[in-house]
UniProtKB/Swiss-Prot annotation:
One of its GO terms (biological process) is tricarboxylic acid cycle. Its EC number is 4.2.1.2. There are 2 substrate-binding sites: the catalytic A site, and the non-catalytic B site that may play a role in the transfer of substrate or product between the active site and the solvent. Alternatively, the B site may bind allosteric effectors. Homotetramer. Belongs to the class-II fumarase/aspartase family. Fumarase subfamily. This is Fumarate hydratase class II 1. It comes from Pseudomonas aeruginosa (strain ATCC 15692 / DSM 22644 / CIP 104116 / JCM 14847 / LMG 12228 / 1C / PRS 101 / PAO1). PANTHER family: ASPARTATEAMMONIA/ARGININOSUCCINATE/ADENYLOSUCCINATE LYASE (PTHR11444), FUMARATE HYDRATASE, MITOCHONDRIAL (PTHR11444:SF1). It comes from the Bacteria. The active site is at 186 (proton donor/acceptor), 316. Keywords: Cytoplasm, Lyase, Tricarboxylic acid cycle. Involved in the TCA cycle. Catalyzes the stereospecific interconversion of fumarate to L-malate. It is found in: Cytoplasm.
Length: 464
């Protein structure tokens, strides 16, 4: 069953049970591309905008109070997720997001008219353009929704997830603060380090990334709403931009404000590019963490084998008993995806022409995917890898005892050249540093035992 809806192009048949109208139906028919639906976070952000706009327009005398109440009620239902199935459009549409903006306008109007006792859909008493979209353009509403969706996702999903992973690593770092092992640079043996110190670097890297993400947020809080079509604010009443930003801030609990330059807010997306760059920095840190733990857990008999990674599942379909570092692999793959998303976002943001960037849907799609992947990745990695991480203390001690770079502690006492000679002799003859040093006669047993003490080589100020 269908009903007839109209727009400026004429009439079109719409499924009878759909809340959307003519423009959404045309988009469905004309843009059957891929399966990437517009993220619901964007839909819900647009619904929040429509609710806030109805309230502000009511206060400013731009809408009849009864129409404003109907819009608010319908928008609240959308925000609650009650009509998610009525937003079927894909990302691959007009670059301004107009089709999705109209999808939201039509669904809210269609539901509002039903609430008023009329048949589903239609344009009376609530019109999707004249009432729901009052004082707005897709050109300012969609970028505003992009900022709202991104900021909410960072606060609600990503920051708590970073805190979980950072906390898990910090706990492991504290637990193993005195477990001495071989440090490595260039993948070669270096001077000693504790396992706790090694893990503390991961915590600090996450902290740098988190601070970069938080530093990007103030610009994301600046909203394009009120700029309307080209940034001038045409057809928006005086004071609308500040009023709707305040309304959105109150509803969301985040400090949104009106962007100081609406022309830039429509034509460019620097705040989201900066946020994406910060997300990439987190991906870089996660890649490092995953790769390091994968190396340390390599083996169990022919690798580093210093760390036992939790076994989440059998690792091979052909090699019985094999366990693979699957959590590290999953985390590193999603880090790659985030880096790729950042490249897409950067290129898309560079393609604004004159007064409008028309790559908005692909920007927000990739940005929200990055946030979701990073949040899920941090939580999953902490729960299924970091929490169950077990260092092999005996293996660490064995490798440390055999390490040649302990000779570095002798530098202040016998000089670099003699210390290097000891290391080369020990390596060439397969003997210990102690034996090589004594054979060369550069020091006696007591001196070696006093000066070469790994547990005292862990901080500045030690000279053996």
């Amino acid at each position: 069953m269908s009903r007839t809806e109209t727009d400026s192009l004429g009439t079109i048949e719409v499924p009878d049970d759909a809340y959307w109208g003519a423009q959404t139906q045309r988009s469905l028919e004309n843009f059957a591309i891929g399966g990437q639906r517009m993220p619901l976070a964007v839909i819900h952000a647009l619904a929040l905008i429509k609710k806030a706009a109805a309230r502000v327009n009511d206060h400013l005398g731009e809408l009849p109070p009864e129409v404003a109440r109907l819009i608010e009620q319908a928008a609240d239902e959308v925000l609650a997720g009650r009509h998610d199935e009525h937003f079927p459009l894909v990302v691959w549409q007009t670059g301004s997001g107009t089709q999705t903006n109209m999808n939201v306008n039509e669904v809210i109007a269609g539901r509002a008219n039903e609430l008023a006792g009329n048949p589903r859909g239609g344009k009376s008493p609530v019109h999707p353009n004249d009432h729901v979209n009052r004082a707005q353009s897709s050109n300012d509403s969609f970028p505003t929704a992009m900022h709202i969706a991104a900021a909410k996702a960072v606060h609600e999903q990503l920051l708590p997830a970073i805190a979980e992973l950072s906390g898990g690593l910090a706990e492991q770092s504290a637990r193993h603060a005195s477990l001495v092992k071989t440090g490595r640079t260039h993948l070669m043996d270096a001077t000693p380090i504790t396992f706790g110190q090694e893990l503390s670097a991961f915590v600090a890297q996450l902290d740098y990334a988190e601070r970069a993400i938080r530093a990007a947020l103030p610009a994301v809080y600046q909203l394009a709403q009120g700029g309307t079509a080209v940034g001038t604010g045409l057809n928006a009443p005086k004071g609308f931009a500040d009023a709707i930003a305040a309304e959105i801030a109150a509803e969301s609990g985040l400090p949104f404000v009106a962007a100081p330059n609406k022309f830039a807010a429509l034509a460019g997306h620097e705040p989201l590019v900066i946020l994406s760059g910060a997300l990439k920095s987190l991906a870089v840190a996660l890649m490092k963490i995953a790769n390091d733990l994968r190396l340390l857990g390599s083996g169990p008999r022919a690798g580093f084998a210093e760390v036992k990674l939790p076994a989440n599942e059998p690792g091979s379909s052909i090699m019985p008993g094999k366990v693979n570092p699957t959590q590290c692999e999953a985390l590193s793959m999603l880090a790659c995806q985030v880096m790729g998303n950042d490249s897409t976002i950067s290129f898309a943001a560079s393609q604004g022409h004159l007064q409008l960037n028309v790559f908005k849907p692909v920007i927000v799609y990739n940005l929200l995917e990055s946030i979701r992947l990073l949040a899920d990745g941090c939580r999953n990695f902490n729960k299924h890898c970091v929490a169950g991480l077990e260092p092999d203390a005996q293996r660490m001690a064995d490798l440390l005892e055999r390490g040649l770079m302990l000779v570095t502690a002798l530098n202040p006492h016998i000089g670099y050249d003699k210390a290097a000679e000891i290391a080369k002799k020990a390596y060439a003859e397969g003997t210990t540093l102690r034996a090589a040093a004594l054979q060369l006669g550069y020091l006696d047993e007591a001196q070696f035992d006093e000066w070469v003490r790994p547990e005292q080589m862990l901080e500045a100020g030690h000279h053996g």
